[in-house]
A protein has these predicted regions:
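Bacterial N-terminal signal peptides that target proteins for export
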Residues: 2-14
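Bacterial N-terminal signal peptides
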Residues: 12-23
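C-type cytochrome heme-c attachment and multiheme electron-transfer modules
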Residues: 24-60, 64-245
Length: 245
């Protein structure tokens, strides 16, 4: 058994197993695309404790129509944090032996952290009804930094929505997933030269592209556009869990 416990192998193996269950048709029924029913629905109709006071639009907290504001990331309606993060580290993390230190968050991880690091107000959006740099009034936010993600049970408990900028007690992101990492770890899937598994088809693991949608998408955020594990590899905020078990 390779060295583990909060290392990447445990995470990677679990993710691959989960994706394989989906591929076999067992887990698909437990999730459905319905962001309005999730805690990521921050509109006034949201079922969570963090939601708008009056704003009824569901998508506007993250997304904006094409060309609604010049000079911003297409379809993204929030500023990105300029914080420097302390990445996850562990003596049992094989990726540290290869990368020396994990890269700064990139891709979808930066998008997630624009809310979840707690440095930016949840209601601050780039465009709202044609008005740039608008603020949506929110309820249920932090008592320490009003408007930002609430602390929940605390960053040291592992049960918080507010991750902060110190990611050492979270799980690895910005991990470059290569055959070298898989070989060193011993439990990860051995991707091919295009970072795909199964080799050639990459139905489960790979970098998303036109006509190619792996179930665990790596993101081309690494050096030389190598595929990396980011938040969006495993997490989709648009999916509603429908299985109470």
């Amino acid at each position: 058994m390779a060295r583990k416990h909060f290392g990447l192998a445990g995470l990677g193996a679990a993710a691959v197993v989960a994706a394989w269950v989906v591929a076999m048709g067992g887990a698909d029924a437990a999730k459905t695309p319905n962001v309005s029913g999730t805690k990521h629905n921050l509109s006034v109709s949201g079922t969570g404790t963090v939601r708008a006071v009056t704003e009824a639009q569901v998508c506007v907290f993250c997304h904006t129509p094409h060309s609604a504001a010049p000079g911003v990331t297409p379809l993204w309606n929030r500023q990105l944090s300029n914080q420097q993060y302390t990445p996850y580290t562990s003596t049992t993390l094989d990726a540290n032996d290869i990368q020396a230190t994990l890269d700064q968050p990139g891709g979808s991880s930066k998008l997630c952290l624009s809310c979840h690091d707690g440095t930016l107000a949840l209601g601050n959006v780039n465009v709202l009804n044609g008005v740039q740099n608008a603020t949506i009034q929110m309820q249920g936010t932090s008592t320490l930094q009003p408007g930002t993600m609430p602390e929940g049970s605390g960053a040291q408990t592992g049960f918080t929505r507010r991750l902060g900028v110190d990611l050492r007690n979270d799980h690895p992101i910005s991990v470059t997933f290569t055959s070298a990492l898989a070989a060193r770890d011993g439990e990860l899937r051995p991707v091919d030269a295009q970072q795909r598994w199964p080799a050639g088809t990459g139905e489960t693991i790979g970098i998303r592209g036109p006509g190619f949608k792996p179930q665990l998408p790596l993101e081309p955020t690494g050096a030389g556009a190598l595929g990396q594990l980011q938040c969006g590899t495993c997490h989709d905020p648009h999916l509603l869990e429908t299985d109470p078990a």
